Design a protein with these regions (language model features):
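Terminal accessory/anchoring regions of large secretory-pathway or extracellular enzymes
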Residues: 1-58
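A short, solvent-exposed beta-strand micro-motif common in secreted/extracellular proteins
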Residues: 70-81, 125, 164-174
Length: 336
């Protein structure tokens, strides 16, 4: 069987397991180190055979061990802020290869971002390449710590690896704070220090900034991690965000506490009751642990019944909130 038929990206370790199961595989062990002999664990390693590529990642010790089908493999090792490494490997059935690879010293930016009082603040930074420097792609768009050309942080002290070049930085924390722009040059193999304070120019005593409709992985319709979602909200200066995952009553408070964001954002347990028609948010709701969906009600077609079920739910506070999302005026509000 041709395990690599056609252009595709496969799970690297699964490929090795299948190759061994079929009886033809060679072993490979790669170790990545920087000039100080410290492990490089943040790299991506692409293996190409013909027109097919598989990707792997080293562990925290900078090691990647796997099996590969026999053949002439091209290997490309890349990491933000380091030069790419290219090598060729001839994998033979029943034989093992060991390689130690030395990567360049990493370049990037170290941030110290504060509020006006000097305390650390959640924030977002966007990197825009200028004068021929390409804008970076730091990762998938639903990840806080490196998403496309942005980085969202739960605190003001953080580092971002960047390839050498010239960048415009835009530091923000939502619409109530002034943004800060800086242009920097990142030298090869060095980190640049950036310090800045974000001024809150819009005063809102007695009011809080809220977002009543958010989701993360437990909702089942997206792959944004819960911690990533909360970091994103805090970086945009959302001060209150009820927990509104699809069809289950959840409380984000433990995540907020683990991230150290108690002073920046708060939540209460709730849910979005969801089906093939109207969607409704409700909070607060008390989770009923060890019950299906933590005791959430079941969705029905009639939006009036859903609203009543949420309002009358045993865990719903009498002064709580129920609203309908993205309403269809004909389906949901027509006279009956």
């Amino acid at each position: 069987a041709d395990l690599l038929a056609g252009p595709q990206v496969l799970h690297l370790h699964a490929l090795g397991v299948v190759a061994r199961k079929l009886g033809k595989a060679g072993g490979l062990s790669l170790t990545l180190r920087d000039p100080d002999e410290k492990p490089v664990s943040s790299a991506s390693i692409d293996f190409t055979l013909g027109d097919s590529t598989v990707r792997g990642y080293p562990d925290q010790d900078g090691k990647l061990e796997l099996g590969l089908p026999p053949g002439s493999w091209k290997v490309s090792v890349s990491d933000h802020g380091r030069a790419r490494l290219e090598l060729s490997l001839e994998v033979e059935d029943g034989k093992s290869i060991r390689r130690e690879l030395a990567m360049d010293r990493q370049s990037g930016v170290r941030f110290s971002v504060t509020k006006q009082d000097g305390s650390s603040t959640p924030c977002k930074v966007q990197f825009i390449g200028v004068e021929g420097t390409p804008s970076p792609n730091l990762g998938p768009g639903d990840r806080a710590h490196g998403c496309k050309d942005q980085y969202h942080s739960e605190k003001g002290n953080f580092s971002v690896a960047l390839d050498p070049g010239k960048y415009k930085l835009i530091l923000t924390r939502g619409i109530e704070h002034d943004h800060v722009e800086k242009t920097i040059t990142v030298p090869k193999g060095q980190y640049v220090e950036v310090k800045s304070a974000l001024k809150r120019s819009v005063k809102t005593p007695g009011w809080v900034s809220t977002d009543f409709h958010n989701h993360s992985t437990p909702s089942g319709d997206n792959v944004c991690g819960t911690a990533d979602r909360l970091i994103n909200l805090a970086a945009e200066h959302i001060e209150f965000a009820p927990t509104t995952e699809h069809n289950r009553i959840i409380d984000w408070t433990p995540y907020i506490e683990r991230l150290g964001l108690q002073g920046e954002i708060s939540t209460i347990p709730g849910m979005e009751l969801t089906g093939s028609g109207p969607h409704l948010n409700a909070f607060p709701l008390t989770p009923k642990h060890h019950h299906q969906d933590n005791g959430a009600p079941q969705w029905v077609k009639d939006p009036r019944i859903n609203a009543l079920n949420l309002r009358n739910h045993p865990g719903h506070h009498p002064s709580g909130w129920v609203h309908i999302n993205h309403p269809d005026m004909i389906e949901n509000f027509v006279d009956r």
